[in-house]
Amino acid sequence: MNILAIESSCDETAAAVIKDGTEILSSIIASSQAMHEKYGGIVPEVASREQLKCILPTITEATKSLDYDAIAVTIGPGLIGSLLIGVETAKTIAYVTKKPIIPVNHVLAHIYANFLDSRFSILDSRFPAIALVVSGGHTELFLMTNNKDLKWLGGTIDDAAGEAFDKTARLLGFGSRGGLAIQETAEKSFTVKLPRPLLHDDTLNFSFSGLKTAIMREWQKNSDHSKKFVSSLAYEVQEVITDVLVYKTMKAVETYDAKSIFIGGGVSANLRLREKFQKTDIPFYCPPISLCTDNAAYIGSYAFFRGHPVDWHSIEAAPNLIVEV
């Protein structure tokens, strides 16, 4: 079964054709990230205007010489203006082609980027699994009992891990490059100590708002913002965030006797995070770097394994779509 997938939740306009949930036949991404650089972050109005310009050319390129049996589209969460472009376009295609349409939760779909890795094959022995979705807007833990059944276990009570990376990058003068800039700069020249939030509480929740405050205080109390200080602060920020993510995930593994770990989302591209997970004694799966950030490929994979076709009239953009399942 071939699925045309459309993703427009933020600043990327993406379309892909996915076969049987595991094979990428095409994947096209039009990014407006460079345009947002001068603003120091994503401007919703600018993002939606770019989505409008890019959506049809992107879909046309993705479907060139390819047939598809159904349409999948991100309905949320995300920016309302951006979501509307993808949703209304998908509904129009469904109406014209008379093909089924499948609404997709963007956050949950990040997990299914793992199923698109050519090295991965779906085996029952890998379940139950713990899935960590970690991005600029979300930090969530799920229990997967098979390739389609998910149960929400916990998430951030304030800011996401990616938000902490992004704000730190801006503070250190790296613009909006976020976690990648922190990763490239991190080097322990001297000791900087930051708190590890909610590390030892009884829940599977996360909190990174206090960490952002602690980072700002550390920056303000050191007047000498030398290269060594910047690299040391970047190192500690990365250590704190990855320590907390791994600790909470492993706590979930122990609680639910999980057999494997899946991660997804933009922060899952962080090499230090991957290194720490690889040092655990449980099978660990992460997507190729190219599938960690927003794209339509994992939207199509999610739709194949977990999606349910609905009447196109009933689909609406849902910017505040909940992730608890």
Predicted regions and their residues:
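Conserved phosphate-binding catalytic cores of ATP/NTP-utilizing and phosphoryl-transfer enzymes
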Residues: 1, 104-130, 302
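N-terminal beta-alpha supersecondary unit
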Residues: 2-67, 73, 77, 83, ...
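A short helix-loop
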Residues: 5-9, 16, 26-27, 125-126, ...
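Phosphate/ATP-binding catalytic cores across multiple sugar-kinase/actin-like superfamilies
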Residues: 57-62, 236-258
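Glycine-rich phosphate-binding loop and adjoining helix at the ATP-binding site
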Residues: 72-116
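Glycine-rich beta-strand-to-loop/alpha-helix junction loops that act as flexible
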Residues: 73-77, 93, 135, 262-270
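Glycine-rich phosphate-binding loops at beta-strand->alpha-helix junctions
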Residues: 82-83, 258-277
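Conserved phosphate-binding/catalytic loops in two-lobed NTP-binding clefts
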Residues: 103-104, 277-299
